[in-house]
Amino acid sequence: MLLPKISILLYILVVLQETAAVRGALFRSGRAVPFERVVGQQDFLRFGRAGMASGVGGGSEGGPDDVKNSYIRVNGEPEIVYQ
């Protein structure tokens, strides 16, 4: 009675581990790129705190521009997609 339950749990663990390994291999090979939305943090990610304080990437007051952009992260680097 206990053996079928243990074998099912073991099967689920193996399948989950293999799925994660395959996704990681595809990502590292460049065949699959997971996209992560970045909302409002693009200036911070690209220029750091000093860039935000000096107004880099923003208006004269140092804030972000009023232009509505979409940001995605590709291989860990933020990319701008203009709408």
Swiss-Prot record:
Its main subcellular localisation, reduced to a broad class, is secreted
CC terms in the record's Gene Ontology section: extracellular region
Identify the stretch annotated as signal peptide in this record.
1-24
Keyword tRNA processing attributed: no
Tissue specificity statement from the Swiss-Prot or TrEMBL entry: Each flp gene is expressed in a distinct set of neurons.
Q: Which domain of life is it from?
A: Eukaryota
Is the keyword Signal in the record?
yes
Q: Where in the cell is it found?
A: Secreted
State which residues form the propeptide: 25-36, 50-83
Question: Which keywords does UniProt give here?
Answer: Amidation, Neuropeptide, Secreted, Signal
**Protein's GO biological process:** neuropeptide signaling pathway
Phenylalanine amide: which positions carry it? Answer: F47
Provide the function of this protein.
FMRFamides and FMRFamide-like peptides are neuropeptides.
Recorded family membership = Belongs to the FARP (FMRFamide related peptide) family.
What protein does this entry describe? FMRFamide-like neuropeptide 23
Q: Which organism is it from?
A: Caenorhabditis elegans
Name the lineage: Eukaryota, Metazoa, Ecdysozoa, Nematoda, Chromadorea
What's the name of its gene?
Answer: flp-23
